[in-house]
Amino acid sequence: MTWLTQITMGSLFDGIGGFPLAAVRNGITPVWASEIEAFPIEVTKLRFPGMIHVGDITKLRGAELPPVDIICGGSPCQDLSVAGARAGLVGARSGLFMEQMRIVREMRLAEKARGRESVNLRPRWMCWE
């Protein structure tokens, strides 16, 4: 990627599309989003009709996703809260954070298998909320 090409983004735990909205306002193209809740998906379909909805993060394979320059995500945090049982990243909900890491690893391995140089592996940037 050079600075003269379009920067692209994928969004995990997309919700109502906060990351894609910020991306568009900054000249970045949202390519795909992962979300499981029906209402938020409908919102993002209206806001971003060209964005692909890829479904449940636990069922995704990073090598099969369209390559993007940036991945954003805000995984559930209930198990990290001091108000809860404090299960941490081994908790059922907050443990989904590790799915984000798996997706990035699988995407980068696929890029490497296609012959891309290590310094150019995508996604190049991650933004976790």
Predicted regions and their residues:
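Conserved active-site and SAM-binding loop architecture
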Residues: 1-129
